[in-house]
């Protein structure tokens, strides 16, 4: 059976991995998942990510902890296959009054809400991370 929402699966694997204090989580790889992982790494929510395997590439995310506590407090899917959520540049949300990030898919690639606002771009709100 095929997966209905691979991004929600990725976010759930991160959430479950951190609640179980796992060092790393693996999942099937895709271009969008790589772009989201890159944003999470740049913002300091994960240590690193790498791709393993040739025929079926797997994405491995090394999770990040601070003083034994998970860095990602909450990670929530916003736009989903059944209900896409798009926002203009002036409508982009601030997560936890600017302490968290919204991951946005724009015409110039996947970026944070802050970067999209600076670039003057709107797009699809993929998820909130705090």
UniProtKB/Swiss-Prot annotation:
Domain of life: Bacteria
Transmembrane segments: none
Pfam families per the UniProt record, alphabetical: Ribosomal_S8
Entry keyword RNA-binding: yes
Assigned keywords, A-Z: Ribonucleoprotein, Ribosomal protein, RNA-binding, rRNA-binding
GO process annotations (BP): translation
Alphabetized InterPro entries for the sequence: Ribosomal_uS8, Ribosomal_uS8_CS, Ribosomal_uS8_sf
Keyword Protein transport applies: no
Recorded GO MF terms: rRNA binding; structural constituent of ribosome
Gene Ontology cellular-component annotations: ribonucleoprotein complex; ribosome
Assembly behavior: Part of the 30S ribosomal subunit. Contacts proteins S5 and S12.
Free-text function comment from the UniProt entry: One of the primary rRNA binding proteins, it binds directly to 16S rRNA central domain where it helps coordinate assembly of the platform of the 30S subunit.
Family under the similarity heading: Belongs to the universal ribosomal protein uS8 family.
HAMAP family xrefs: Ribosomal_uS8_B
Name of the molecule in the record: Small ribosomal subunit protein uS8
Gene behind the chain: rpsH
């Amino acid at each position: 059976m095929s997966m209905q929402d691979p991004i929600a699966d990725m976010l759930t694997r991160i959430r479950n991995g951190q609640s179980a204090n796992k060092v790393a989580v693996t999942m099937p790889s895709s271009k969008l998942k790589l772009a989201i992982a890159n944003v999470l790494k740049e913002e300091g929510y994960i240590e690193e990510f790498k791709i393993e395997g040739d025929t079926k590439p797997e994405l491995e995310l090394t999770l990040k902890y601070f003083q034994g506590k998970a860095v990602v407090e909450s990670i929530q899917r916003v736009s989903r296959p059944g209900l896409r959520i798009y926002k203009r540049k002036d409508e982009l949300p601030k997560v936890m009054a600017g302490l968290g990030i919204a991951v946005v898919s724009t015409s110039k690639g996947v970026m944070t809400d802050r970067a999209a606002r600076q670039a003057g771009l709107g797009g699809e709100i993929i998820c909130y991370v705090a």
